[in-house]
Swiss-Prot record:
Biased composition (Pro residues): 124-138, 303-316
Function comment: One gap junction consists of a cluster of closely packed pairs of transmembrane channels, the connexons, through which materials of low MW diffuse from one cell to a neighboring cell. May play a role in myelination in central and peripheral nervous systems.
Biased composition (Basic residues): 112-123
Gene: GJC2
Residue intervals on the Extracellular side: 47-78, 236-263
Official protein name in the record: Gap junction gamma-2 protein
Pfam families per UniProt: Connexin (PF00029)
Region ranges (Disordered): 106-200, 296-316, 361-429
Organism this protein belongs to: Bos taurus (Bovine)
Keyword tags: Cell junction, Cell membrane, Gap junction, Membrane, Phosphoprotein, Transmembrane, Transmembrane helix
Amino acid sequence: MTNMSWSFLTRLLEEIHNHSTFVGKVWLTVLVVFRIVLTAVGGESIYSDEQTKFTCNTRQPGCDNVCYDAFAPLSHVRFWVFQIVVISTPSVMYLGYAVHRLARASQDERRRASRRRPSRRAPRPPLPLPPPPHPGWPEPADLGEEEPMLGLGEEDEDPGVAEGLGEDEEAEDTGAAKGAGGDTKVAGVPGPAGQHDGRRRIQREGLMRVYVAQLVARAAFEVAFLVGQYLLYGFEVRPFFACSRQPCPHVVDCFVSRPTEKTVFLLVMYVVSCLCLLLNLCEMAHLGLGNAQDAVRGRRPLPASPGPMPRPPPCALPAAPSGLACPPDYSLVVRTAEHARAQDQELASLALQALQDRRALGDLDSPPGPGLPANARGPPKPGAPASGSGSATSGGTVGGQGRQGIKPRMGSEKGSGSSSREGKTTVWI
């Protein structure tokens, strides 16, 4: 036992810290400190001379060996070493399964991520800008119409692409949380998920059933070894032992070295075994109560979380006249009656100004514009054809005749055309 190395078993048990609860970490501490260290350090020095110092009051050859075998069928130290190995076996098997499961899950996540990346749709190309207006056309005046919404903003992004990006980020976060070995605290997760307890992490990794199974196996082994230790050694080491086995000629008395020290050490190992069994039971109760609380919380209705602010309803544009259509990706904007009257008055004032300019230049023989009011027109010449009575409030008549004698501004403002302002396309009617 002096040359026995515990480094491999110790390193293996330390890996269990990464995938166990807080109570499981306490159990592992008790196992390493009070069992492995005590057995390796204290047991070797106490039981090193247990057979050499075991003497009997006879000189019969072989009687000492036969009586020692009857006193201790299995050495205390070897019994405790075997107990440590057997009780640690379920935890080691659980660790192997957990490592295999997590490695396989990470590989599956990488495959799914690689399949999702080529299937993403390319981002939409920007809409082509409309052609620039004619150099001679002025920019249309701001008549108060609402701007059409033609561009696709961030909120209109393809939901499939956004969903794929979100899944990739979630997979990367999950892989990073699983790859964090010794730290069971999930960074950035408030509440019970970010606490020191690793129960939620075991649930997230899908290892709860295997973890409970290894707890049950450990508890069963603890009970079995406690019963076996009592049947083999009892609760004390007697200072002498009466032996009547062959080849002893008669009943001989054999004496044990350091019986009190060995009795204390035996009782300490009893206490450690009972403590480990109690920790196993507490851990099973902790997992059961935690799962029950999660089930109760899951049945309760969740409080309404403050969501995003509701969007205001879109402003309804004036209805377009029946029979009018617009190309795709264009919005049809119709002027209101107030805007029409204001523009007609502006056209009338422009026509009156043009007539005054012609009179100043001496061109009095030309008939006035049909869009002028009645009081602004001169007396008609005899024999001249009667001009049509154009209404100043008729947008179509003024717009139709404004192309003949009025400036290009009137035609561009009244006629049906398209212009570009701030990169957005608007159809004016």
